[in-house]
Amino acid sequence: MTAYNLLRESSVHIVHNGSRYLLKTTPEVSFSQTFAEDAYEVKTLHDQTKMFQGTSVTKANPANFSFAVHLTQEKDESIVKSLLTDYDTSNGEQLLKSFDLYIVTGESTFKLEGCVITQGEFNLAKGSPLILTVSGQAKQLSRVGNASYSLPGSLVNASSTRTPTLSLLDVEVDSTDVPNLATATLQVQNNINWTPFETLQNSLSVTSVSNAMYPTTYTLGDRVVSGNITQYLTSNNSSTFQSFDTSANVAVKTIVNDSTFLNANLTGCMFTKRSNVAEAYTQTFDFRLVNSPANLGTIITY
């Protein structure tokens, strides 16, 4: 009987520093990798002035992946936030923490090797579960075995319960509360550049996917922290309609059981305001941390 790979039967595992984490992701999981084609002109035997295009495939583009997790009160998902924000300085330079990602279905086990998270977004909608959506790139995607493949790493025990966070949203701009909040988002973008990895010598020996050239190393460029804050336009705040600032301090936090849960303390932001016309008028602060932060792990805590 033919076995299919079904998303609803899939499980997602992170392997980092010898530890394995089984993630409870939302259904929005995706991953892929494409190969680069090099086309060239080829003359025909009967007419040397006529050309057709030949092709050569010797290298792969970086693989892509994305998934989302609920940030629960037990904080079993803290590894995802750490991989998004924290540096790996073990080699004497500031790089992102890398990891391997395994997706296990009822038929296959897929591996994304050398993953780095390039973007993460915290969805802080008022009265909704707190969700972290991440996407990134990896060196190589492969099928490493069937569903019974033995995953590496020591499994980190998860909590026996999972409690979603229906958070109370609290936002301050220059130490002043932003009233009448509707929603907010917080985004981290890690801009990376893969080091050129194609060589003529290696390209001549490529015969299949098994010996094709794959990305190996990258450099980390700038890091951007940004987001938006949407509030209802009322008599309490209409006097600040259509404003901007180039040096403001923005604090975004969620409160769970009267305690701070997620906290982003951003010093030195620019923001602009824009209006939104709907049944209830709103205005949105679009903000960005002006400087590339030295240590995001201490600026955004969870």
Which stretches of residues belong to each language-model region?
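Signature of extracytoplasmic/envelope-associated structural regions
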Residues: 1-302
